From Swiss-Prot:
Highest taxon in the source lineage: Bacteria
Record InterPro entries: IolE, IolE/MocC, IolE/XylAMocC-like, Xyl_isomerase-like_sf, Xyl_isomerase-like_TIM-brl
Enzyme class: lyase
Entry's family note: Belongs to the IolE/MocC family.
NCBIfam families: myo_inos_iolE
Protein name: Inosose dehydratase
GO biological process, one term: inositol catabolic process
Cofactor: glutathione; Co(2+); Mn(2+)
Source species of the chain: Erwinia tasmaniensis (strain DSM 17950 / CFBP 7177 / CIP 109463 / NCPPB 4357 / Et1/99)
The EC number(s) this enzyme carries: 4.2.1.44
Amino acid sequence: MDKNKVKLAIAPIGWTNDDMPELGKENSFQQIVSEMALAGFTGSEVGSKYPRDPAVLKPMLDIRGLEIVNAWFSTFFANGDREKTLDEFINHRDFLHAMGAKVIGCSEQSLSIQGTAKAVLEEKPHFSDEQWRLTVEGYNQLAKLAAEKGMTVGLHHHMGTAIQTCAEVDRFMAQTHDDVYLLFDTGHAYYSEGSQQAMLAMLEKHLARINHVHLKDVRDEVVAEVKAQRLSFLEGVKRGTFTVPGDGVIDFDPVFKILDDSGYRGWMVVEAEQDPARANPFEYALKARRYIRQHAGL
């Protein structure tokens, strides 16, 4: 892959988990960003321990050669919370714009079970036609608001949400305008569909509208536990559903080739949440960086 087109970032979720603050509570912001830089990454997404004042955050990243590339934003259009979502989005957009980011990754969290004790596979939510309409209209509006600052919006398909499966992603992309993009996540695509083939099919089908990429690997044996024991999304994470590229079942070589052949420009982000007490974040960041260097040439 071309280093002039594609840059590498890593998310702080491997150090400390915003959905389960007890995981990695001992890891400070300063430690997190220092270890990211030491591991050889040049970008970061935003976690709960990050200062939200750009005047404070930016110098701390600048001295480490890091920049902010995205920050999770939860939308609630299907619930009918349009105005509240739009107001909060504008504040979020302005923060990311001040930090120099070009992408805003959003997840539609109406009916989401990702933070609950419900079985992530058996009890996933589904939208009615009206909820789909509200979501599509909302994301079309987000794209306009993002464009005011020269930014783009990407939908983060996610386990435990109503936009998770290939079919649901297809419907979302077909119904939204072309200026609404997809934040493609290898781990969530594989986890949802259960195969490398289906994950690659999602990537190839929506290649022209992918504006951000999350790289995470999957441990099949843990997914089997999640299915057999009807576990929640977060319980699966604690047991090790996800890991860094090269440490699980996914073959990333075709992912890198497809993106490279398409002329993809932007960030690839190692975003692999697991229990830092079981998987040392710095060691796993180094492992991911080594694998990507060997397999993507970055």
